[in-house]
Amino acid sequence: MSNLQSIIEAAFERRAEITPKTVDAQTKAAIEEVIAGLDCGKYRVAEKIDGDWVTHQWLKKAVLLSFRINDNQLIDGAETKYYDKVALKFADYTEERFQQEGFRVVPSATVRKGAYIAKNTVLMPSYVNIGAFVDEGTMVDTWVTVGSCAQIGKNVHLSGGVGIGGVLEPLQANPTIIGDNCFIGARSEIVEGVIVEDGCVISMGVFIGQSTKIYDRETGEVHYGRVPAGSVVVSGSLPSKDGSHSLYCAVIVKKVDAKTLGKVGLNELLRTIEE
């Protein structure tokens, strides 16, 4: 365990005692170092190690502690003002820094300090919370919310109104993860630490949490908390055992590999689900 991690772990055990007035200099410096590291991509709350996603709980604890050490303060936002504990990521950015980091930010997009935005990303009017990681080439479309500590892969398209759940409210054990080369359809919600593996296509209006049945119609298998790589998923329902009613589920209607996904349009994939 690193010294930085040990400071965070110890502080978290006495978090109820920590306020902006009582926090000691060492703890405050450690928390601020973590937030700065998350902000620039040095740290990630979750990362893939040997093919499996691993959550670094101590980094998540540092994010939670950051709310304990700061008072609300006035935040300028061009035509308006805000009053919050967490600074905005781009508050001190210059044109040169935007050019250097290589992403686009459309007016009204909001990103909290402590979230990482990689190059070639486009942020339409959307919200990215503290601790989130948005990787290269991703489109974050209008009214998307990327929750605290959520992990978004490379070349992902988060369509209009998509919600990616966070870990802070309500408190979750693990962040929601969207793998590389995924398409998440408009108004869909992926929450509660669900993992959408690489190359998935999620249709419009699909809601997936840890208790959602994810039914593979080809195999009859039911998954929870994980959408297998290359899945094309739509909303559906499954009948109860006695046939008296049906309950919502997500249905894997087909699987596609990266080559097919690259050649075939998304609309074509979704319009041929009855084959």
Curated annotation (Swiss-Prot):
A Pfam family hit: THDPS_N_2
Reactions accelerated catalytically: (S)-2,3,4,5-tetrahydrodipicolinate + succinyl-CoA + H2O = (S)-2-succinylamino-6-oxoheptanedioate + CoA
Taxonomic lineage of the native organism: Bacteria, Pseudomonadati, Pseudomonadota, Gammaproteobacteria, Pasteurellales
Pathway: Amino-acid biosynthesis; L-lysine biosynthesis via DAP pathway; LL-2,6-diaminopimelate from (S)-tetrahydrodipicolinate (succinylase route): step 1/3
Gene behind this protein: dapD
Cellular component terms per the entry's GO annotation: cytoplasm
Swiss-Prot/TrEMBL GO biological process terms: diaminopimelate biosynthetic process; lysine biosynthetic process via diaminopimelate
Recorded family membership: Belongs to the transferase hexapeptide repeat family.
Enzyme class, first EC level, given as a word: transferase
Species this chain originates from: Mannheimia succiniciproducens (strain KCTC 0769BP / MBEL55E)
Protein name: 2,3,4,5-tetrahydropyridine-2,6-dicarboxylate N-succinyltransferase
Annotated positions binding substrate: R104, D141
Signal peptide residues on this chain, from the entry's feature table: none
EC number assigned by the record: 2.3.1.117
Subcellular location: Cytoplasm
GO terms assigned for molecular function: 2,3,4,5-tetrahydropyridine-2,6-dicarboxylate N-succinyltransferase activity; nucleotidyltransferase activity
